[in-house]
Regions:
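Hydrophobic faces of well-ordered beta-strands that scaffold small-molecule active sites
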Residues: 1, 93-95, 167, 204-206, ...
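Catalytic domains of carbohydrate-active enzymes, especially glycoside hydrolases
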Residues: 1-7, 45-47, 367-378
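Substrate-binding/active-site clefts of carbohydrate-active enzymes
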Residues: 4-162, 176-196, 200, 214-215, ...
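Short, flexible loop/turn elements at secondary-structure junctions
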Residues: 5-7, 58, 63, 99-101, ...
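Anion-binding catalytic surfaces of enzymes that hydrolyze or transfer phosphate/sulfate esters
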Residues: 13, 318-346, 351
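Active-site-proximal helices and loops of the catalytic beta/alpha 8
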Residues: 16-19, 36, 171-325, 360-361, ...
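A solvent-exposed, charged loop/short amphipathic helix patch at secondary-structure junctions
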Residues: 23-29, 346-361
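Aromatic/acidic polysaccharide-binding cleft in carbohydrate-active enzymes
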Residues: 218, 336, 343-353, 378-385
Length: 385
């Protein structure tokens, strides 16, 4: 079970009496195509109880709005009880950790913590002295020793005190590789006899995107996809997602891929090039899928479109390499996640108008099968409320 951020975040009022809600009876009375539902929800968005939680304030403390009482020790005891209960069902608990930024910074904001400890140290600044904001806001600087120490110590704290089974790093590529490797080593050193935890069973993975001020090693060697091979740390394999579905998270969601109709059943929603261009793309996308199902291993060889054996590392993908993993567990294969449309919604957006519903359902099953039958770690997005 992958939990969205569960540390103390600042975007939801912790006490239920301070949280605003919409009158659900009134909402249900509105026509299904009315704009009033979204307008009503948006009007209280800053004060309701819904937020993903990517707004860290205190890293080492469970979020109070999830507890029956945010004051006192209830949040600690209840989080531990939840993890224990999931373990009793045979389920492992992975927590989402967001060490790449903080909700606030500066000396005066009530949700600013690190800048009040040592002003200007824990956050990454540009040459003009302003905070880097490429993660969203207030990027942290794990290249600085004590920010790195905070991250490593906090991960060990969650492993030992709350018995979680794994960590999913948000925007892991904005952390230094050295930091994540130190965290791995610290966690792997935990033993049942000494710490009550078998650290060798704890899995680390994250978003290894390489962009903005950390791209290309400009700050230091970062924990991005191409740098993680051999570490045993996993990263999300967007090659599979984009090969199967088509497009990218930041492009037009109607761009097709291998399983959504590119070349074989193109939609007419947008210009995707002629048959020759689409055939070239569908072959390239197929190579991404082949490599991913073999664990995205950089040394895995397949026969390319020209009939020659090609190592996965030499197959090109948006100016980078398709294969980058040294071992299957360094690849987290997926075709949908919480950031974008659900898998079926993505298929509905991309499929040609004349594709019947039962075929769209078969496409959905086939897309899931590429994850289920691939080497590596399998990530399946099924939200629970």
């Amino acid at each position: 079970v992958h939990l969205l951020p569960s540390y103390d975040f600042g975007s939801v009022p912790e006490r239920s009496e301070h949280q605003k809600t919409v009158d659900h009876a009134w909402l249900s009375s509105l026509p299904s195509n009315s704009p009033d539902q979204q307008a009503a929800v948006a009007s209280i968005a800053n004060d309701d109880a819904f937020n993903w939680g990517y707004d860290p304030v205190h890293y080492g403390v469970p979020e109070g709005s999830y507890a029956t009482n945010p004051d006192g020790d209830a949040r600690v005891l209840e989080f531990r009880t939840m993890v224990q209960g999931l373990a009793g069902l045979g389920l492992r608990t992975i927590v989402d950790v967001v060490y790449n930024h903080t909700l606030s910074a500066g000396p005066t904001d009530r949700n600013s913590v690190l800048d009040k400890v040592v002003p200007g140290y824990y956050h990454r600044r540009n040459f003009d002295g302003h905070y880097e904001n490429s993660t969203c806001c207030n990027n942290t600087a794990s290249e600085n020793l004590m920010m790195e120490r905070l991250i490593v110590d906090d991960l060990v704290h969650w492993a030992v005190s709350y018995k979680v089974d794994g960590f999913r790093f948000d925007l892991m590529g904005h952390l230094m590789l050295r930091t994540v490797v130190k965290a791995r080593d610290a966690i792997k050193s935990l033993t049942v006899k000494r710490n009550g935890v078998d650290g060798s069973k704890i899995y680390l993975y994250g978003e290894g995107w390489d962009y903005a001020e950390v791209s290309g090693g400009r700050v230091g060697t970062n924990a991005s996809q191409l740098n993680l091979g051999g570490t045993g740390i996993g990263s999300f394999n967007d090659r599979l997602r984009e090969g199967v579905m088509g497009g990218s998270p930041f492009g037009d969601p109607r761009v097709q891929g291998v399983m959504t109709g590119l070349y074989f059943h193109p939609n007419n929603f947008m210009e995707q090039g002629g048959a020759e261009a689409q055939l070239k793309r569908v072959i390239e996308d197929s190579e991404k899928v082949i490599a991913a199902m073999a664990g995205n291993l950089r040394e895995f060889e397949f026969t390319n479109k020209d009939g020659y054996p090609t190592p996965s590392r030499d197959a090109c993908w948006v100016g980078s390499n398709v294969g980058y993993a040294a071992q299957p567990k360094e690849t987290v294969n997926y075709v949908s996640a919480h950031d974008n449309e659900t898998l079926f919604d993505g298929i509905m957006l991309r499929s040609a108008v004349d594709v019947p519903l039962d075929v769209r359902c078969r496409i959905n099953r086939l897309a899931v099968a590429t994850v289920a039958f691939s080497q590596g770690k399998h990530f399946s997005f099924t939200p629970f409320h």
